[in-house]
Amino acid sequence: RLAQNMPLEVEPDGQPNSKNIPLSNLHFNIYYHLGLAYYLTANYEQAAKAYRKCLQYSNNDDLLCATTDWLYMTLCRQGKMTEASQLLEPIKEKMTIIENESYHQRLLMYKGLRKPEDLFPGKSGNEDETLNLITQGYGVANFYYCTGKKEQAQDILQKILRLDNWAAFGYIAAEADLNRGL
């Protein structure tokens, strides 16, 4: 409600991207992180509501991919696979992605254009690569979970926690899922 009647304004993110172009806006960040908070507490109905609102403020391909990915996973957790699949319509192989390549690749996996094992090969190196593995890994784990491959999902979630990057959203989500007995 705080931003309801406020104009859309670019919000500089913590770390500059490769093009030094801030991509997110205040409204996006409010609804994106609200959706994440609901998702992490398994309140998928409220998470979906927040992510749908967030889509309204996803005004570039990076934000569209990030929001679509979390909303897709949220709908999968609710068993709404048809609705989740419909979200993938605007996602194309060629998009203008500056920051959220991991989310873009996950969405292409959901569409059947990438293989899960290509997104999460199970190796890690530098800090950026570790963050990428955590992000990719969580999407792959969730994909396995939602397609009935619970053991494979649990295996990847445990691998994510061994990568030890506790601030990454995928790490936090993996920890929450394992604590809930996924």
Regions found by a protein language model. Give the residues of each.
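Flexible helix-coil transition and linker loops at the boundaries of alpha-helical arrays
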Residues: R1-S24, Q56-D61, S124-E127
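Residues that mark the junctions of alpha-helical repeat units in TPR/alpha-solenoid scaffolds
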Residues: N20-L23, H27, L64-A66, N126, ...
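Residue-level recognition of tetratricopeptide repeat
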Residues: L36, M73-C76, N142, E175
